[in-house]
Regions:
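A generic structural signal for secondary-structure junctions
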Residues: 79, 96, 105, 123, ...
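A short linear hydrophobic-aromatic micro-motif
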Residues: 123, 251-255, 286-291
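C-terminal coupling/interaction segments
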Residues: 268-313
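ABC transporter nucleotide-binding domains
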Residues: 4-6, 11-208, 214
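ABC-family P-loop ATPase nucleotide-binding domain
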Residues: 1-10, 307-313
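Short beta->alpha junction loops/turns
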Residues: 67, 236-238, 269, 293-294
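ABC transporter nucleotide-binding domain
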Residues: 175-267
Length: 313
């Protein structure tokens, strides 16, 4: 079953196509990453999917509801954490959570239980009586994410939810979200931290200049588009004559990090590595260690955006 289905969805402002005929299919219970550079159309897409703005053209179904014709029905079943902080400055953390539950008509007994659970889960107990205006950026962000779990929802939109969080708190939040997805919650997740997307997302779409340029799982994106490989070799020693021989190998870039370490970058890594090993063996240079560095999502993202930009010029 799909939580989000978009067909030829577009949003135009005058002559500018902010979102240009995109298709999306987000399955229920998955964490779906939505990545793109600044100005790519991410924010406009989120506003379309959360019914904050209507599309210029195209079809949009959210949780099986026609979101263009029945936006209020959609809003009653989703949660949204936008990038801009939203809070009442004079309310305490505890009262912020409780009031948000009241807005969603959550009964008092259930609200009280959920407040305590979320204060514990998001490490907010020690600041429960602190006013929102006195919180740090990271603390406000935690409150903003936590309060969405005061009500029952089937689909959650998160726009840069880890801004201002330290690494430990960030990982704890990501694990919490992954567990929620395993319980059936669908999460639409945007971030500029590509390692986050690689860790949490089941599937990823990359948008650039209003168009979707790739959709796949993180692993499949790396397998499909990860052309260049990086190999590190630790040697017992290397002199200039050997480095000159290595520099003459085609189809690669070699960095000599010190007298004993070299890093090879190549999209023909197997062929290049054989040539390097032959040179080292012929000159009796022992290899202390050899390791391949896997392609990461950030490299794929940059490569695809660069290719997309070049294709549009």
């Amino acid at each position: 079953m799909s939580s989000i289905t978009a067909n030829s969805l577009s949003k135009t402002y005058g002559s500018i196509k902010a979102v240009d005929g995109i298709d999306l299919n987000v399955r229920s219970g998955q964490v779906f990453g939505f990545l793109g550079p600044n100005g790519a159309g991410k924010s406009t897409t989120i506003k379309l999917l959360t019914t904050l703005i209507p599309p210029t053209s195209g079809q949009l179904s959210i949780l099986g509801i026609d979101a263009v014709k029945k936006p209020l029905r959609v809003r009653n079943r989703i949660g949204v954490v936008l990038q801009q902080p939203s809070y009442e400055p004079t309310l305490s953390v505890e009262k912020s959570l409780d009031k948000y539950g009241m807005m969603w008509n959550v009964p008092q007994k259930i609200r009280k239980k959920r407040v305590e659970e979320l204060l514990e889960e998001f490490n907010l107990k020690e600041i429960r009586h602190k006013k929102n205006d006195d919180l740090s950026i990271g603390q406000r962000r935690r409150v903003q994410v936590a309060r969405e779990f005061m009500h029952d929802m089937e689909l959650l939109f998160l726009d840069e939810p880890t801004v201002g969080l330290d690494p430990t708190t960030r990982r704890k939040l990501l694990d919490f979200l992954k567990n929620k997805a395993k319980s059936g919650l669908t999460i639409f997740y945007t971030t500029h931290v590509l390692s986050e997307a690689e860790y949490i997302c089941d599937e990823i779409a990359i948008i650039n200049k209003g168009k979707i340029i790739a959709v796949d799982s993180p692993d499949d994106l790396k397998n499909r588009f990860g052309r260049e490989k990086t190999i590190k070799i630790h040697l017992s020693g290397i002199d200039k004559s050997i480095s000159d021989l290595l520099n003459n190998i085609d189809d690669c870039k070699i960095d000599f990090n010190s007298g004993t370490n070299i890093t090879i970058h190549s999209d023909k890594s197997e062929t290049v590595l054989l040539q390097i090993l032959q040179i080292l063996n012929n000159n009796n240079i022992p290899i202390e260690d050899l390791s391949a560095i896997p392609t990461n999502l950030e490299e794929i993202f940059l490569q695809m955006v660069e290719y997309s930009d070049a294709s549009n010029n």
